[in-house]
Amino acid sequence: MGEVIWVDMQAIGPENSVGHKIRRLLQEAGVLGGLDAGARVALKINTAEEGYEYGLRPAFLRTVAEAVTNATEQIPTLCDGLKLVDYWRRMSGSSFMDVVSRQGYSSDTLGGNFVINGGFSGDEGNIYPCGGADTVLGGVEVGAAVCRSDRVWVLAHVTLHPLLGVAGALVNGGFECLVGRERTRVLAGIDPYPFNGSRPGRSALSGFRHRALEGHLGVRQALEGRVFYVNYVWDVTPQPEYFPFSEAPVGPSQGFLASRDPVALDAVTFDVVAETASPGGRTAVESAREAVEELLSVAEALGLGSRTYTLRRLS
Amino acid sequence: MSEPKCEPTKWHELTAPVVGDREHYQKKSWNPVKHTWGPYTQKGPAPVWFADANATNWTESMIAKTKDLFYEAKLNECFEKGDEVAIKIHYGEWNRTAVLRPEYIAAIVEEVRACGGHPYVVNDTTLSYHIFNSMAYSSYQMEGAIRHGYTSATFKCPVIVADGFSGEDDYRVELPEGLILKETYIGRAVAEADAMIVIAHARGHAITMYGGVLKQLGIGCQSKRGKYITHLAHWGDPHDAIGWPKFTDQCPGKACKFHEMCDNSCPRQAHRVLEHGKEWYPERCRLCYSCQVTCIFSGMGGITFEENYFPNAMIAHADAALGALKCFERGKVGFINCAIDVVPECDCFPWANKAICPDVGILASKDLVALEEATLDLIDQAPVSPGSVAEEKGCKVGDDKFRVVNGFSPRITMAAAEKIGLGTRQYQLTHHEPVLTPENAAKWQIRPDQPTTVRLRETFHRNDLATEVMPFRREAYNKEWVWNEWKKFDPFKGEPAG
């Protein structure tokens, strides 16, 4: 049973600002005490595609980076991998950094060293097994900034996802931590942009979800389980950050949830999003439910965590 | 870009993280060599432009002259509109003071962008070099770069470590032309660029004697793997060959006050201090220089270099430079040497000694060997700086300064470079002296089209801040002091008693 902590958006005040809430979440989760001085911590974040306008504000991530700096006396690494758009041509590290910069993300604003997970090419990493012989992938190549760190905290901007239902801890802590060519392999020909009218079939989608979650097993293997997840339920848009556009969020922002169990965390997160969706966003949320159900059940079956959870809500 | 030719990984046979071996990596790698690579100069001496370090008006600002040279040397023709243009610089070691000022780099970035290129600033990770190195680890290197003022905010373009988080994001380049090396590895942010402008701080170097644009290619563009190869790691037998540290009988063992630093200087724990002397495990050594440099920096003599190591390394780094040049079509790389703060040692040193000569100026060319030769000649012709190591060693105007200061002539590198097709040592130097005209004065200003005074005129028209508080308060003051007393403070005569 996974334990999830939720710091909601109630009682906002001068001593309970968003920053206070994020700091409290980390304290209550007990993760800061587990950081040794000198530990190299990587914070996996989302850097939105050009045209996506609901990315997290840098201060939300900086708050965590500063907490890590205080605990480890080291400047943490913040990272994200190259996006999937036109992978072989447009997605060079330089244009990726240009887009990142335009979103307001830099080492200055984020409070740590921002790097591309996988280097300029997006392909720098190491191969780790995903589990036993019955896995589809066998092993995956995890990006260098993630797999060469002592610990990884996945700071996920929660959104809906056209292929996986929801982009939260499971997606950002797994598929999104892989090197570029590995993600191409996991996609196996699936077009991640269904708005182009190329919606894959049910069977292809199920296969992709399974492979993406196996990728998460590889990441956990790389970090020997030293992974912590924070879901930012903030501006939950129908599109994920790799889309070149974004519609209005499906409901009001609900705060921040954290856990060491990505399955429990995503399960709670989707429940919270569904319960608080605005009338205009409900259709999008409900249309994602089936995919989320499959995502969570496969993740649980693979041993990534438990859908059963205890929730501690802090206001 | 073509797909890599490699055997599929046998995923289901994996039981643990894969430790890549040479065979595995080379199969994964592919060769980015361009079909039309080659030295820029096909015949005769290569044109090199030079602007000296003097400045007395707007047009003679070193930054303005750097921009002038960019166009005079036709570096703007190295790339097309829309090209990804790598701006290769050295990010500088932590506590290094003699690095290029960010303004020189920003100036070139601005012009690359103005010409339609997409610039990004790059440098590769280094090997460990010494115990407190900040450049071997990409996140440390970026902290150092920011400390030197090299940021995306300063340059208004991405600032990237070219070979990735761990220095493994690279391409293998084959070098059949090499005099020593037959392959090397280039950081991908360099190798994948459409064009490159190399901006080098021209100064000395402890291994290659001198470091300018060729050094930026021959070491600066090499990934970690490329640097190991260029260091000639593991050439010959450990006990008598050049590609290994040389352990002398001068190591005092644990009596050395630096012995703990010495033990910690190796990232592979390839040596250990004993009560008397050291124990060395050559099978662990990769020749990163850490033990040698840490020992030398500490003023000790227990670990050093083979005597013939240096000229061999100089030739090897010319080979490696060719590896970087081969990643570009002919004429797609432009070179700038900034002979400013011409100190005896490399920017990877965590300090800077006194300059061996006064600032010389800026040089630019599309032929890197000609540019290096011209830079060396101008440095040699410059006066020797008082109090510098050059003066200490008896260097005279016209001497080969870096040979006197560092031991071997950098012309060894240039001869090797010319031999393998990096360029020509013959050059034709054009001394660029900007003419002071209203157009030239305005050309490189922050707002060339609108003088600041005109802008302020508009501002003052709306709100004249001075008028609001005028007249300023004036009170009686000691006129004797203001009119006469200060004249008595002649620094050469001293303040009069009483």
Protein language model annotation of sequence segments:
Chain A
Residues 2-80, 85-315:
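Extended, low-polarity segments enriched in aliphatic/aromatic residues
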